[in-house]
């Protein structure tokens, strides 16, 4: 068997990393393999780059290689050095004035932990992180000081004049793995829609990749605020605000110490979890959270026939409907969903009026949902 020469080896190494980290055909993790939905649109990467991706990548690494930073496991970050970029409203005080410009400046294929520090201000822009630009951290000066916002809805025309749909309405879209956000607000400025309004889904944040973590962030919107789409995600000490189905998707996510706040005029719902098969290891777990707000709320609606949501050690205000859960108008889903409650408090936590197909969990039943093991967090999160 012929030996690889010195120029072939780096190419092969990069190719293997691309295949392992950035496959566009599946979303997988250690607990299962999930095919992408057929109707999911892939996000195209920048098409106007003409340099060899490896040359471009190594040039950038040499330029900033002396800077140091680490968020996730040191083993992964030892592959290449990491560095920091700054975004500031004033061009003479930062590297960039827009968050998207900072992201676009990175090499086409990125394996370096890049920390983008965003100074205080409201950044009115629509931001999307392409699938191959992994290991990005967005860090604000405080969730109440640093905001990125846009105002698209599912009805907003795209470049071809067609409605862009819920998926593309996101003000901020994460499509690459190992993303971290700290102390920043993601907002969709669309007002609360009238009951029964069509096409008013307006996503503030969409997370469509594995191994994403959010610390001290705010997600502000109305209908469909947080599209917790695919992958394993961790939300710590975050504030999430909306009206109807404002935490939805088919991710495997742990919400710890988060404040969930409803701004519904009348009837709303916190979650719409989309698990569609018993083989899918997805679901939402809320641990030591707080649910407050206006209107009256379901804890969740069965968007997927095997929808799975658990609330544990969570305070619930009196806005929670006694029934707690809604079957999406399909009684057959009552046999397949998994909706649980464990040692919750507050006027809205009274289990006496809950639907018969919800569960008051025992210690043993609740245990898998209470810690980072729910999302294999010890493998990829460094707190």
Curated annotation (Swiss-Prot):
Domain of life: Eukaryota
Recorded GO MF terms: pectinesterase activity
Cleaved signal peptide residues: 1-28
Catalytic activity: [(1->4)-alpha-D-galacturonosyl methyl ester](n) + n H2O = [(1->4)-alpha-D-galacturonosyl](n) + n methanol + n H(+)
Keyword Magnesium: no
Glycosylation sites recorded in the entry for this protein: 44, 183
This protein's name: Probable pectinesterase 53
């Amino acid at each position: 068997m012929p030996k690889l020469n010195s120029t072939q080896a780096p190419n092969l190494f990069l190719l293997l990393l691309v295949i392992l980290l950035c496959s566009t055909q599946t979303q997988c993790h250690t607990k299962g393999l999930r095919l992408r939905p057929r109707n999911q649109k892939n996000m195209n990467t920048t098409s106007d780059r003409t340099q060899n991706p490896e040359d471009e990548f190594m040039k950038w690494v040499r330029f900033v290689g002396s800077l140091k930073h680490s968020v996730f496991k040191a083993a992964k970050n030892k592959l290449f050095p990491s560095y920091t970029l700054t975004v500031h409203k004033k061009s003479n005080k930062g590297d960039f004035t827009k968050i998207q410009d900072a992201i676009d400046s990175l090499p086409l294929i990125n394996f370096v932990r890049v920390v983008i520090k965003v100074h205080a201000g409201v950044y009115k822009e629509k931001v999307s992180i392409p699938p191959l630009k992994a290991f990005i951290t967005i860090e604000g000066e405080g969730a109440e000081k640093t905001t990125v916002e846009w105002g698209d809805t599912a009805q907003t025309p795209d470049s071809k004049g067609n409605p862009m749909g819920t998926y593309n309405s996101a003000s901020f879209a994460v499509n690459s793995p190992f993303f971290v956000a700290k102390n920043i607000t993601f907002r969709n400025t669309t007002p609360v829609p009238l009951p029964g309004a069509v096409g008013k889904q307006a996503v503030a944040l969409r997370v469509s990749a594995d191994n994403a973590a959010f610390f001290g962030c705010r997600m502000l919107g109305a209908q469909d605020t947080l599209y917790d789409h695919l992958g394993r995600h961790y939300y710590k000490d975050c504030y999430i605000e909306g009206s109807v189905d404002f935490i939805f998707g088919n991710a495997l996510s742990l919400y710890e110490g988060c404040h969930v706040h409803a701004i519904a005029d009348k009837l709303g719902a916190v979650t719409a979890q989309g698990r569609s098969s018993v083989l899918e290891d997805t679901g939402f777990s809320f641990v030591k959270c707080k649910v407050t707000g206006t209107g009256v709320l379901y804890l969740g609606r069965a968007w997927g026939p095997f929808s799975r949501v658990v609330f544990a050690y969570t305070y619930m205000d009196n806005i929670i409907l006694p029934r707690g859960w809604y079957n999406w108008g399909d009684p057959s889903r009552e046999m397949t969903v998994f909706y649980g409650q464990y040692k919750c408090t507050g006027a809205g936590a009274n289990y006496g009026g809950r639907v018969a197909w919800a569960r008051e969990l025992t210690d043993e039943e609740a245990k898998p949902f209470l810690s980072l093991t729910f999302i294999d967090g010890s493998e990829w999160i460094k707190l």
